[in-house]
Amino acid sequence: MSNENVADSDVRRKGGLGQRIAYACGNLGQAAFYNAMSTYFVTYVTSCLFVSYSKALAAQMIAVITGLIVVIRIAEIFIDPLLGNLVDNTTTKWGRFRPWQFIGGLVSSVLIVLIFSGMFGLVNVNTTLFIVLFIITFIVLDVFYSLRDISYWGMIPALSSDSHERSTYTALGTFTGSIGYNGITVIVIPIVSYFTWTFTGAKGQGQAGWTSFGFIVALLGLITAWTVAFGTKESTSALRAKAQKNGNPFEAFKALFQNDQLLWVALSYLLYAIANVITTGVMYYLFVFVLDEPAAFSITGIIPLIAGFIMAPLYPILNRWIPRRYLFTGGMVSMIIGYTMLALFSSNLPVVIVALIFFYVPAQFIQMTAILSLTDSIEYGQLKNGRRNEAVTLSVRPMLDKIGGAMSNGAVGAVALAAGMTGHATAADMTASNIATFKTFAFYVPLVLIILSLVVFWFKVKIDEKMHAQIVEELEAKLASGEIVDDEAQAVIKN
């Protein structure tokens, strides 16, 4: 075996059981954190944060806060590649990614408690100061959560350069992510209701309950981030040595825009993410204001939770025989069926439950295909442009999720205000116009986006397992022959 192959075997080898478990744990809290921020924070804002205000003033404040969230998140979209470049240029004895798991997990966990507490009651004391501090806090929170998210998924190519081994790590992260994301949906109302009653003796979802919910999410996020920080170890290879010199942010942006496969995968995933997060973001309103079945809302967490248990481990097994392109396509077709049923039968609970199965079950296949395609585009970009940008490339997915989250926040706020689904409103108050507005935002617009996502992926995304294997082989040959020259890469090969 050549020295080159010895070097590359470090990054190709299968990770130990402990490392796999530690890595998998990370997305449990990270996904729960994301769902709390992208979905339930706006639910908290529209239903509880301004409950002591007059109806007119509360509506104004809801519009202001949800608008600010959308603006902040869209603005920070352009920061994510810079954060990826920061991670790529991090050099510590812990490696490139683990320090940001430690720091990002700590800071974001502290700040999420702050925003779910109404800035510790400041919202009811000084509205202007509350808005100012909220903007600052939300920006800092979003930045440090992004650093955690980018470093988590950016770690995959540091663990293996083999496409199938990467799918194992991706499956583990997606599996626990499904538990965290959907588990929050299952427990949010019971937790908020329980702690509201415990601290105030009142029924419903009050401030004390939402603050307790924020604290639980923060604790889970901190523990799981630190599990990754202390439980994993990055590998080295000639391929990864190219990433040691990542240059300035301008070069990072240039590398992204020159990687055509990255851009097409990103566009397809963006269309999916916007559709998916908008719909999941307004599910609470479907059960409360359309179906008038708030007690059944937990089904929107139970179905995807069970689906995650089955589909995430199944993906790498099926992917050994079925190309991920077809797994992605099958998932999209299932979602189209689900959307159609939801749009036509949104007031029929049994049909809605069946539709939710079609909607939620394929999520793992779609998301894992996108993540793996983005990950494999790292070597594609390295071969095409001569630069390897791991964290910068993989910062694209969190950036796209952030766009989806911003759209979800905006859509939830718009639906709540336009359809009168705020404050003490009930299902009995809803009119046909209210329901039509809801269905347009929740189902019809996302359905169009899902169809467009499938079209882009099928006709523009070319990178697959076979193509990636050929790229890695060609890269290794060029590094060994000196056709691609990099001092640190050659040092790894020689050693």
Regions flagged by a language model, labelled:
Residues S2-N495:
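Membrane-embedded alpha-helical bundles of multi-pass transporters/translocases
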